[in-house]
Amino acid sequence: SSPLKHVPLSERDENDPEQKLGTVLDVILSEFDKLGYKTVYGVLDAVNYGVPQFRERFVLIGSRDDEDVFLPIPTHFQMHQDKKYQWQTVRSVIEDLEFDHGECATLSEERLKFLKMVPEGGNWRDLPKDIIPIAMGGAYKSGGGKVGFYRRLSYDQPSPTVVTSPVQKATMMCHPTQNRPLSVKEYARIQQFPDDWVFTGTTAAKYRQIGNAVPVGLAEAIGKTVLSVADNTAIVQTKRFRGTNVHNKIRNAIELGGSLYAVK
């Protein structure tokens, strides 16, 4: 996390000490403590709560009624003996929209030409070697993994994090098999909005609204946990963890009296 004080590089000299990382969070937690709040925080990935998407978000929950507070217990896993507890995939939410996808952004003819060469689940690295420098332009020699360039989703994996536009060159979100970006409706499905949810404005504005949202499954998990603390029905459960490598960690945390997870 960020240092409390930021000194621009242009204003630093060799004698300036490095600012301690994490001091912003330390101050926030200290202020909550002064106000009498118990807090718990962590980074939650929506894919672990039934959302067909990898989407990490920092979550902080607090209470000042002398209640123990918890983060929501994960409900889904990459591998689990029970399929209903396995990660949800792109296929599970958009396959039926292949020929009824609705409103959709468009790619330029230049980008579309290169996308047609990329297989399902692939990206720019799957282009012919002699084509890559042309397709990537100046980004070809830049740093970073550049995984979003000419990216097609995989039907049988969770989606990457939905961003505010599927057609930005560095963060493309393209259909697994069709030569187009994900549609507005497909975007909404991955974020778990119901089909009758109304988004307003231009096509770009609709993508932005969806991309900025908290996925329904993650929001629901947080809401239920807060409610269970408020009405004093929070209990720690481990049954659903059986068959996963998380089970022992949760069991040990309970034995130590300090589990961060709860469900209603």
Language-model regions, residue ranges each:
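S-adenosyl-L-methionine-dependent DNA methyltransferase catalytic core
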Residues: 10-14, 30-41, 53, 57-264
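Acidic carboxylate-rich catalytic motifs and surrounding loops in phosphoryl-/glycosyl-chemistry enzymes
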Residues: 1, 42-49
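A mobile, often basic/glycine-rich helix-loop segment
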Residues: 1-33
